[in-house]
Amino acid sequence: MALPIIIDCDPGHDDAIALVLALASPELEVKAITSSAGNQTPEKTLRNVLRMLTLLKRPDIPVAGGAVKPLMRELIIADNVHGESGLDGPALPEPSFAPQSGTAVELMAKTLRESAQPVTIVSTGPQTNVALLLNSHPELHTKIARIVIMGGAMGLGNWTPAAEFNIYVDPEAAEIVFQSGIPVVMAGLDVTHKAQIHAADIERFRDIGNPISTIVAELLDFFFEYHKDEKWGFVGAPLHAPCTIAWLLKPEIFTTVERWVGVETKGKYTQGMTVVDYYFLTGNKPNATVMVDVDRQGFVDLLAERLQYYA
């Protein structure tokens, strides 16, 4: 039986590719997609979900827009990474269908209520919508199998020296998720910076030769440029969000540890930092499965294999 999932995302190039991967995978049943503000404004990320589902010919999947700002802060966006549209690069279709009239939280709650089995929530943007769901529907916690997030880092940040972007945007929401008691799987920068797509990989995807693999290559062409900056020390571009879906499909290509994670919400220098108790110093029981490494070639091969689904 396919694993039921809800995807909460803020497309964004890597989020768009995560959608492509999820919808090419019969092991997963995508029951709903909700949009969060982060990589771009809430209007643009919602539009980008609809554009991607139009491209992938999946207007049957319910879509709803989420919170317009973080729980307690003003919104920060990453337009310097993802461009004016949030998906700059390829020519994507205009949406062929409309989102649901309700909110992301309402769609998530309805999906959980109606599911015969617990649902995995995959959250690849800031955690605002998921935190709102957890706070407003405690009766539905048992319907959530796990929450798989792209966010955080044991080591270095990518938005501040200490903080990864998604967590920095809404640290209060992330703290709610980590302390919810629901199993959390964290794909942070420790693993996503190892899930780099090289120039040769982009050409491999392009050579698959179907319309979707071509679009993915064009998304990566744009995304690649930002990551050429020498400060990162990258060979390629890190594919953050797809690590969440790849872990659901092939956990064996990832190395993980079980640790307690908390989120710093007030630090002068460390606001938005995910504090990972690697050496069990706090006495707190582990609340997260933390990805620390990935078989990069296995990750690339999985993407290439699933892109052939769209032939």
From Swiss-Prot:
Parts of the chain that traverse the membrane: none
Function: Hydrolyzes cytidine or uridine to ribose and cytosine or uracil, respectively.
Keyword terms: Glycosidase, Hydrolase
Listed EC numbers: 3.2.-.-
UniProt KW Hydrolase keyword: yes
CDD domains: nuc_hydro_IU_UC_XIUA
Protein name (record): Pyrimidine-specific ribonucleoside hydrolase RihA
GO biological process, one term: purine nucleoside catabolic process
Species per Swiss-Prot/TrEMBL record: Salmonella choleraesuis (strain SC-B67)
Protein family per UniProt: Belongs to the IUNH family. RihA subfamily.
